Amino acid sequence: MSTWMMFMFQESNSLYADNLVSFHNMVMIIVIMISTLTVYIIFDLFLNKFSNLYLLKNHNIEIIWMIVPIVILLIICFPSLKILYLIDEIVNPFFSIKSIGHQWYWSYEYPEFNNIEFYSYMLNYSDLNQFRLLETDNRMIIPMKIPLRLITTSTDVIHSWTVPSLGIKVDAVPGRINQLNLISKRPGIFFGQCSEICGMNHSFMPIMVESTSFKYFMNWIYKMN
């Protein structure tokens, strides 16, 4: 989860989040290199003696500044597309979880387990011995290290189901079903919030995901049934 003075990503807890962080680092290295080169050229132009003052054209330079940006864009493009398809492609999920956005709370369904269904509301301030605006009365429970399918939609306006540490952000659109892969690589409790402005209480739509062992998950399913 986010903390004060945190300027980087949250600690990644899924393969997708790892890939996104690595991609971000690669892009930032490219941006820093380009920025450094640009600043150097600017200072060099100010400090030189105008030795190329009457240079009107140079085909070699023009070819270089056309090819180099194309190569840089391709270097950025291919990893980006790979991550995009990895997140969107559903490969043999163990089961599906349906997340439905409402104004201003979430509901969850487990269709493969006797249609378990429950609502998830933000806890009141008076209940706080926990994290402000992030704790919910019911958590979405998932088994760790098992590929799942998250299906999301909405009953009213557009919401967005987002858990940064899992590398997940998917819009919940009324009348439409979106899906993506969901997998956690370690046990823990992960926090998120609705990331699409959806009305007056948009800021009070927290998401709480608990990743547990498969044995504990099945015990929870048994109790819910």
Swiss-Prot record:
Q: What are the record's GO terms for cellular component?
A: mitochondrial inner membrane
Topological domains on the Mitochondrial intermembrane side lie at: 1-25, 83-225
Where does the protein end up?
Answer: Mitochondrion inner membrane
Question: Topology with regard to the membrane?
Answer: Multi-pass membrane protein
Q: Which residues lie on this side of the membrane: Mitochondrial matrix?
A: 48-62
Identify which cofactors the protein needs according to its UniProt entry: Cu cation
Give the catalytic activity: 4 Fe(II)-[cytochrome c] + O2 + 8 H(+)(in) = 4 Fe(III)-[cytochrome c] + 2 H2O + 4 H(+)(out)
**Keyword set, alphabetical order:** Copper, Electron transport, Magnesium, Membrane, Metal-binding, Mitochondrion, Mitochondrion inner membrane, Respiratory chain, Translocase, Transmembrane, Transmembrane helix, Transport
User: What's one Pfam family here?
Assistant: COX2_TM
Positions bound to Mg(2+) = 196
Which residues are Cu cation A1-binding? 159, 194, 198, 205
InterPro entries in the record, alphabetically?
A: CcO_II, CcO_II-like_C, CcO_II_C, Copper_CuA, Cupredoxin, Cyt_c_oxidase_su2, Cyt_c_oxidase_su2_TM_dom, Cyt_c_oxidase_su2_TM_sf
Q: Name one GO biological process term.
A: ATP synthesis coupled electron transport
Query: EC number(s) per UniProt?
Result: 7.1.1.9
Q: Kindly report the protein's main subcellular placement as a broad class.
A: mitochondrion
Note on how the cofactor is bound:
Binds a dinuclear copper A center per subunit.
Superkingdom in the source lineage: Eukaryota
UniProt GO MF annotations: copper ion binding; cytochrome-c oxidase activity
- NCBIfam families per record: CoxB
**Quaternary structure (record):** Component of the cytochrome c oxidase (complex IV, CIV), a multisubunit enzyme composed of a catalytic core of 3 subunits and several supernumerary subunits. The complex exists as a monomer or a dimer and forms supercomplexes (SCs) in the inner mitochondrial membrane with ubiquinol-cytochrome c oxidoreductase (cytochrome b-c1 complex, complex III, CIII).
Family, similarity comment: Belongs to the cytochrome c oxidase subunit 2 family.
The name of this protein is: Cytochrome c oxidase subunit 2
